[in-house]
């Protein structure tokens, strides 16, 4: 299958990129810059991953999305949630932290942008980095979302593009394990909400990745602030 991969440079999208290569021809990796805090880090990580796998890479600029987003993922004056590891699976708390980093219709917008390229490049699928952990509080991370988006694209694309995530039913531990099997270059990824010199080790994205690595007895990538 020919595919376009949405690549943020983070854990989920990087593993999906690596897996998509085993399933067919990845014609393009797309990174979206919506002025998120970690934009420059995500773009750099995505570019390195695309270069590593010899895949064309393109950055799409969406500055207006930052203008209408009022949450901490974009607004530097807002405090990012820093849940403790033991709080990650508490749904009520997770729902609150999700609301603090929500971006309006983000994944809906992203998969449709990718579908434009997929149609033009004669690709059957758009690959996105979803996971079942965050699907509990982010409905646009669910298999149901992918199916609904695919259904709409039966009408909106000439070649009936579908949305697919190879990790949509996996938790972070399983995703890291899959990345290990695929020999993913962990040192190239960026899975932090912040855009500092090193991944902070405190935000929810970092916490979920740290828990996954520790549960598998793996050392964290060297670009973590909190390394063993």
From Swiss-Prot:
| Keywords of the record | ATP-binding, Ligase, Metal-binding, Nucleotide-binding, Queuosine biosynthesis, Zinc
* Positions bound to Zn(2+): 192, 200, 203, 206
Pathway note = Purine metabolism; 7-cyano-7-deazaguanine biosynthesis
The residues that hold ATP are 7-17
Annotated InterPro entries:
QueC, Rossmann-like_a/b/a_fold
> What does the subunit comment say?
Homodimer.
Q: Which HAMAP family match?
A: QueC
Protein name listed in UniProt: 7-cyano-7-deazaguanine synthase
Species whose genome carries this gene: Desulforamulus reducens (strain ATCC BAA-1160 / DSM 100696 / MI-1) (Desulfotomaculum reducens)
């Amino acid at each position: 299958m020919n595919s376009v991969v949405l690549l943020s440079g983070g854990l989920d999208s990087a593993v999906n990129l690596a897996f998509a290569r085993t399933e067919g021809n990845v014609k393009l990796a797309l990174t979206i810059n919506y002025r998120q805090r970690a934009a420059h880090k995500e773009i750099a990580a995505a570019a390195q991953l695309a270069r590593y796998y010899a895949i064309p890479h393109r950055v799409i600029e969406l500055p207006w999305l930052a203008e209408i987003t009022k949450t901490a993922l974009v607004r530097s004056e807002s405090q990012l949630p820093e849940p403790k590891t033991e709080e990650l699976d508490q749904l009520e708390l997770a729902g609150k932290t999700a609301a603090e980093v929500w971006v309006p219709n983000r994944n809906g917008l992203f998969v449709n942008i990718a579908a434009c390229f997929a149609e033009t490049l004669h690709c059957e699928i758009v690959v996105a980095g979803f996971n079942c952990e965050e699907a509990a509080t982010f409905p646009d991370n669910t298999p149901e979302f992918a199916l609904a988006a695919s259904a709409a694209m039966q009408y909106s694309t000439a070649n009936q593009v579908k949305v697919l995530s190879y990790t949509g039913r996996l938790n972070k531990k399983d995703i890291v394990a899959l990345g290990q099997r695929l020999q993913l270059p962990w040192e190239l990824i960026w899975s932090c909400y912040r855009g500092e010199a090193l991944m902070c080790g405190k935000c929810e994205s970092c916490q979920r990745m740290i828990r996954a690595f520790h549960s598998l007895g793996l050392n964290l990538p060297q670009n973590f602030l909190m390394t063993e």
